Amino acid sequence: MNKKVIIVGGVAGGATTAARLRRLDENAEIILFERGKYISYANCGLPYHVGDVIPSREHLLLQTPESLKSRFNIDVRIQQEVTFIDRANKTVSVKNLATSQESVESYDTLVLATGSSPIIPNIPGIQSKYIFSLWTVDDADHIRQYIRQNKISDAIIIGGGFIGIEMTENLRRLGITVSLVEMLNQVMAPFDFEMAQLIHKTLEENGVSLYLGNGVTSFTETDESILVNLSDGKQLATRLVILSIGVKPNSELARSAGLALNARGGIVVDKTLRTSDPDIFAVGDVIEVEDFISKGKTMIPLAGPANKQGRIAAGNIAGENDQYPGTQGSAIVKIFDVCAANTGANEKTLLKNGLIKGKDYEKLIILQNSHAGYYPGASPMAIKLLFSTDGNKIFGAQIIGKEGVDKRIDTIGTAI
């Protein structure tokens, strides 16, 4: 009898699991449920679609229900939400969001790839029509349309993480004046403070107003705009606020099914990506992972690890015995004409974990050219390297520069 596998959620982890499983098992019945309209898209490209760097949304769509069906014989059901898991009878309850019709589907193996959602804090005025978040293709469409219809000339970004920084650049590209508000004393938390100063300098040189160490206490709507009230008493007025303060795992389905979760709501999995129920796997932003450096538990919502997890889960469903080694957290972001990349742990994390500089680790910060200085076009880059005092282990690295950042961070990441 052929195995029946149900996958809940598409995009990175779910779609990868489905495609890889089909390559390993030609006979399995594979059903993928996705509550949205799109099952596989480049979510990292959404800010660049808003900024018209990627003008066509079709370029963001990696797979469609039709392509997955024709190429991999996968039964894709979009706009259908799995609302309940009956672990005892190995069934899921499904609601068709277009027709409100409800149904029940059985499974042999279940994969949860429910992803994450933007954090919406409980701040007065947060539900304003002027406040947007960017996480899906529909979000990008909505923001693009709003900017054009309302001839937006200024905006406020709340949060200086990857999405906040990329949206800042892309709104400036559209000629929009941007203020960036960050509760911490720096943007880009994966970078240490001294390295983040180079990012601050780049942002300010490109006309971005920074409000660092400043939280938002409330939002107040006026007749034609919204006031962003900051913790230091300042008020900033605008007609467009982009909220990008982080994400939370979509683990409500797992919680209602009684699966083990961590304190942040992440699904607990073993090295084979099985949950506390051996017939249920989980991958992507929704799971707790092992930090590759510290070996502690953490949450790292990145597309690259989600894809790797999808491949490993598919292999194990097909009878292999692969293990996920943990997430290193390598990432890179473009900030106007500069690239900033990191891999492994930063110094803040080492100190938090009890390591002592000079005893447990050393750091090296150097400035070097992107290529030989005698050849025209070389540009400077800053490199911070964290390593054990005996020189046998690299803990992490951060690099900021205009050229050659990617290949250097790749090399260090591989060495780690």
Question: What does each model-identified segment do?
Answer:
Residues 127-151, 223, 227-229, 234-316:
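FAD-site-proximal beta/loop scaffold in flavoenzymes
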Residues 2-4, 286-404:
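Mid-to-C-terminal Rossmann-like scaffold of FAD/NAD(P)H-dependent oxidoreductases
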Residues 112-174, 209-210, 263, 269-271:
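Glycine-rich dinucleotide-binding loop and its adjacent helix/turn
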Residues 105-115, 158, 236-246, 310, ...:
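Short hydrophobic core segments
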Residues 1-11, 152-161:
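Beta1/beta-strand and adjacent pyrophosphate-binding region of the FAD-binding site
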Residues 61, 154-155, 162-219, 300-306, ...:
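Rossmann-like dinucleotide-binding cores of NAD(P)H-dependent redox enzymes
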